[in-house]
Regions:
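Conserved N-terminal beta-strand and adjoining loop/helix that marks the start
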Residues: 1-21, 40-43
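Hydrophobic (often cysteine-bearing) scaffold residues that line and stabilize catalytic clefts
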Residues: 6, 47, 140, 144
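Anionic group-transfer/hydrolysis microenvironments
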Residues: 18, 27, 130
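A conserved beta-turn-beta hairpin within the catalytic core of GNAT-like acetyltransferases
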Residues: 29-32
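A short gly/proline-enriched turn/hairpin at secondary-structure junctions
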Residues: 35-36
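Unchanged
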Residues: 41-138
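Charged phosphate-binding loop/patch that engages nucleotide di/tri-phosphates or the phosphate backbone
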Residues: 130-171
Length: 171
């Protein structure tokens, strides 16, 4: 076990009108791994501000295009595999402790632009939130299961239908 600290981060589950979750395929990986937007919390920055900043930096989605649905009052933690400790984040962190936010996307797909000044994703898509854990790198699967469980009451029995206004639900 390492004495390194955890990196403070914010994570975002962005759902569309059909209750699907946004995922991006990481630019810096050769793996077929996808993830939701996330990133570091700057010193002195509150987690919600970090989440909306990261969402903008990674997807081009501005804060006026989202509505906050839920924000669990807890942190979610994962450890890097031993072979990655010391190799990522300049060797400063053992993993991440994350605050997660569930946002409803109010915009259109054209409002999403992953070709940002410092791109993180090479492609993106909307998926059923239930598929999230199987699409991420193995060391983040437990965290994604926990995040999904925390947001499930807001996603409804069909994973998302409760969060979608009745008029916008697929027929």
């Amino acid at each position: 076990m390492t004495d390194l600290p955890y990196r403070p981060c914010a994570g975002i589950m962005l759902i569309d009108r059909q209750g699907r979750a946004f995922v991006g395929q990481r630019m810096d990986s050769t793996l077929e791994a996808w993830q939701m937007p996330q990133g570091g919390i700057d010193p002195g920055e509150d987690p919600l501000t970090a989440a909306t900043r990261e969402l903008w930096e990674e997807t081009g989605v501005a804060s006026d295009k989202v509505e906050l649905i839920a924000a669990p009052d807890r942190e979610f933690v994962y450890d890097l595999p031993d072979e990655l400790i010391g190799k990522v984040w300049k060797g400063k962190w053992r993993g991440q402790r994350q605050r997660w936010f569930l946002f409803r996307f109010l915009g259109e797909d054209g409002d999403i632009d992953i070709a940002t000044p410092h791109p993180e994703f090479r492609s993106w898509r909307w998926i059923d939130p239930a598929d999230l854990p199987r699409l991420v790198v193995p060391f983040k699967r437990d965290l994604y299961e926990e995040v999904l469980a925390a947001f499930r009451p807001h996603l409804g029995p069909q994973i998302g239908m409760e969060a979608v206004p009745q008029a916008d639900r697929p027929r």
